[in-house]
């Protein structure tokens, strides 16, 4: 009888199974890692442990992976399925030498020497019983629950107390064939493999648990002893004519107001609550790109998460996802408005640090906050902040606030040793709880102050909210970014470290816009966002079911065949499935008559649904512009369409944070896809097939309101070439209100003054504003914008501008 089949061993496994709940990272190793089911597989573990292998066995049974108890058969010879780097630690004395474990590596390498076709995958597996990073002063707790190399007695205690928080993490497989071919098969290579494995497990533990937590008061005193803080305190005392002790006391109060007080115990409790909450709210949370972030952590990067801000749920969602993806929840920069009882203390113990809306005029507060942020980076804590500064009320990304990004970049300039990397994160929901409140605020109602009653009110309304989406965008490593933007930045700083570089502000602004662009690059297309985009482009927000299905299938085909970026995700299924999901979530309305089903958006929900449309409108705005050219312009050639797109793209880019690498290639690919879909023909010029006209008109409707805004602006510019920027913004907004009243435009962003401000800044940058040297360009773009509008809308704009000009 084998050891694992003995009654004693089975009894131990049965007891452990009752005590242990295991979370697997990643959830699907075959999909997220480079595992090949057709190649033999061997697990590499740090320490030989009966309980660890038993926990791994439960996971492998669940995932359909080879059992750790099942030996590997290599051409009739048996090899171990699990290779450990070191032996178990005895209760007393030292663990045995590593010769036995090195022999396991040597046997596997020798098998590759004998069998040239053999290619075993070595898969590192890390096991964690709880994820407490430990504190600088918790030596007693560490003695009882020492996690790195526990004895069997300590392991029993860990299983009893932390068994419900067991994590099994698989890492990328390594080819043993590659190692044998490149480095040989002798004992020296086995030793190297074991050494590499030890380093891997050490780094992996730090990714999973994070750095040791400092004592909060000791941290405060250490921060106040830094040279920069001493200088700031002295300046505060001199400027306010107070004692240094009083200034120091003020600095300590600021630190107490700002600093997080991370508690692993609270995080474990919150994890259980949030698991219940997400299961109650959502049918699932879709995640894309987590593996690249795990790798950045593993490689020693200081990670700064910069998500978009849709809802108060964002704070919880990203931390929860990172926890379950085997990473430490970040320290989150939260607005001081969220520091209300009892949520504030709970957020603080969950990792939140609080930030005032404005630092202006308060040099001591600025110095304290900067020093605290530097300390987070220096100690290796990941950080999260929202660059928009507040939640988007329209579903579009807001213009970035650059304060936190500037502070992060300044930390790099002051010499943070580890590479600091910004990770843009797209957060999306099939239902945002605050949408109704947002539209009340947009219509003039005063914003409610956050309180515990709002939280209770939100929880009371819990229901089926569909799915959530977390997509990690393309990371931006700040050292590389600085090298790209200012190649000589190190030399300049070395010459005068105290002087603010003249290039810093434009470099920060460019970085902030790049972050926002990469958030949008990682957008998630869902059933709700896509159906709302289609229906809101129709005349009555309603379509026949068959027509809606056909249109959704077209959009899905465009998004998958010509992907916006490699970071974008597109919902699985066809148009029929997307409609069914929308109906289930009560976002769509179904009416039936003898001629068939009609799918619509209820009038009471129409404005709210613009929020979801706006989440992804940037993904289909270029296809929509192309469709406008094809349906509104006679004998449109490929070159003419490309020229039209190039005219409007700078404004679209500024408004929607778009970042298409090669615009001309992208337009050509979209045109080729429309040809492949059978909607158009090409013979020097494009012609629309009769069967494709309705689909293209509907696609063109997505950019309709945007083109109306551009037509307003360029008609005003053409009539008054030297118009001032403030006057253009005011007149554009006034004309938009008139146009909306006459043609029933209800989308909130159509009347957004800030949007016209963004466009006017871009126009000035392009040289179109207050400069008649570009009058020919303005006239051309005005003509193109007018040609893409319905005749009634065009006439309203032309007549209104003429009346304005004559007044």
Curated annotation (Swiss-Prot):
The keyword Transcription does not apply. One of its GO terms (molecular function) is glycerol-3-phosphate O-acyltransferase activity. One of its GO terms (biological process) is CDP-diacylglycerol biosynthetic process. This is Glycerol-3-phosphate acyltransferase. It comes from the Bacteria. A motif (HXXXXD motif) lies at residues 308-313. It is found in: Cell inner membrane. Pathway: Phospholipid metabolism; CDP-diacylglycerol biosynthesis; CDP-diacylglycerol from sn-glycerol 3-phosphate: step 1/3. Its EC number is 2.3.1.15. Belongs to the GPAT/DAPAT family. Keywords: Acyltransferase, Cell inner membrane, Cell membrane, Lipid biosynthesis, Lipid metabolism, Membrane, Phospholipid biosynthesis, Phospholipid metabolism, Transferase. It is a peripheral membrane protein. InterPro entries: GPAT/DHAPAT, GPAT/DHAPAT_C, GPAT/DHAPAT_LPLAT, GPAT_PlsB, Plipid/glycerol_acylTrfase. It is an enzyme of class 2 (transferase).
